[in-house]
A protein has these predicted regions:
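ATP/NTP phosphate-donor binding region
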Residues: 1-78
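A glycine/threonine-rich phosphate-anchoring loop and its flanking beta-alpha core
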Residues: 97-181, 185-186
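A short, small-residue-rich loop immediately preceding and capping a beta-strand
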Residues: 71-94, 98-107
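Oxyanion-binding "anion nests"
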Residues: 186-204
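Short glycine/serine/threonine-rich phosphate/pyrophosphate-binding segments
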Residues: 35-38, 61, 86-93, 112-115
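Buried hydrophobic packing segments
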Residues: 67, 90-95, 166-167, 187-193
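Structural motif
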Residues: 9, 25-27, 77-80, 101-106, ...
Length: 204
């Protein structure tokens, strides 16, 4: 028997950010400075929210505890992980602890963290991978807006990451016909996105 676990809702495509209605009093968790997060939040069209932007790269359980300690009493309606894997990993773990739903919005691509049941956090200085259905997003929003303005180096690394993830998933002993179908479609999209018009030279 095979089991496929995915978020309750996945919204993807151009303008997915702006066409989503966000609950009032949401807590947005990110790693980026205000000059960038302000631009992203304006694109989202979110009005009533709290912002926590102190998450560090490669976060630890201490980052999770800091979010819970500061915001649990403020009773946010939902936690929104906006950014790379660091902010999403923190929200994945913190939201169940606060008994709140979570929205994950990746600003890069490649790992697919927004649709997995995995959160990677440092515990006592050591990276630890947590696996649990409670870590799945309630809503994942994937919008190409972020990639259009991303530095080339991030696009390149994300594309390489996506290729590696697809290859690993396709060859996984836990794979099945459904996951292999998704991998094949991903390879098709990657070929179109990574190769240039003459199909001979890799843009990367």
């Amino acid at each position: 028997m095979h089991t496929v676990r995915i978020p309750k809702v996945i919204k993807f495509g151009e303008n997915a950010l702006g066409e989503t209605e966000y609950p009032k009093n949401a807590l947005v968790v990110t790693t980026v400075p205000p000059e960038l997060s302000d631009k992203w939040l304006a694109k989202m069209g979110i009005q009533d929210y709290m912002l926590y932007d102190q998450v560090k790269p490669e976060p630890s359980i201490d980052d999770v505890n800091a979010v819970i300690s500061e915001y649990k009493s403020k009773n946010p309606s939902v936690l929104i992980g906006l950014g790379g894997g660091s902010s999403m990993d923190v929200v994945k773990y913190a939201a169940p602890e606060m008994k709140k739903e979570k929205i994950l919005i990746p600003t890069t691509f490649g790992s697919g963290s927004e649709v997995t049941r995995i959160s990677v956090l440092k515990v006592n200085g050591k990276k630890t991978s947590f696996h649990n259905d409670a870590l799945l997003a309630d809503v994942a929003i994937i919008d190409p807006y972020f990639i259009n303005s991303a530095p080339f180096e991030i696009i390149k690394n994300s594309a390489i990451d996506a290729c590696a993830q697809c290859t690993e998933a396709y060859d996984s002993k836990n794979g099945n016909s459904y996951t292999k179908f998704l991998c094949n479609k991903a390879f098709d999209f990657l070929e179109k996105g990574v190769l240039n018009d003459d199909k001979e030279k890799i843009v990367l």
